[in-house]
């Protein structure tokens, strides 16, 4: 089953992306570099709980 997750910027801008992931094939927390439009550069986004 794919669960909804929130990827939050580590730059401290408060920007986030929402996506889904398969917890069975990827049980660890996701970390991915994506573009932060507030900081206007690519930064590390870390998985947090989607409320």
Curated annotation (Swiss-Prot):
Keyword Cell cycle found: no
Swiss-Prot/TrEMBL GO biological process terms: translation
UniProt cross-references to Pfam families, sorted A to Z: Ribosomal_L33
Example of a GO MF term: structural constituent of ribosome
Keyword match Lyase: no
Bias type Polar residues, positions: 10-20
Annotated keywords: Ribonucleoprotein, Ribosomal protein
Region (Disordered) residue spans: 1-23
Database matches in SUPFAM superfamilies: Zn-binding ribosomal proteins
An annotated GO cellular component: cytosolic large ribosomal subunit
Family label: Belongs to the bacterial ribosomal protein bL33 family.
HAMAP family, sorted: Ribosomal_bL33 (MF_00294)
Protein name: Large ribosomal subunit protein bL33
Species, as recorded: Chromobacterium violaceum (strain ATCC 12472 / DSM 30191 / JCM 1249 / CCUG 213 / NBRC 12614 / NCIMB 9131 / NCTC 9757 / MK)
């Amino acid at each position: 089953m794919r669960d909804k997750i929130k990827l939050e910027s580590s730059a401290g801008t408060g920007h986030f992306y929402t996506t889904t992931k398969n917890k069975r094939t990827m049980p660890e927390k996701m970390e991915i570099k994506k573009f932060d439009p507030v900081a206007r550069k690519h930064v590390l986004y870390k998985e947090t709980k989607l409320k």
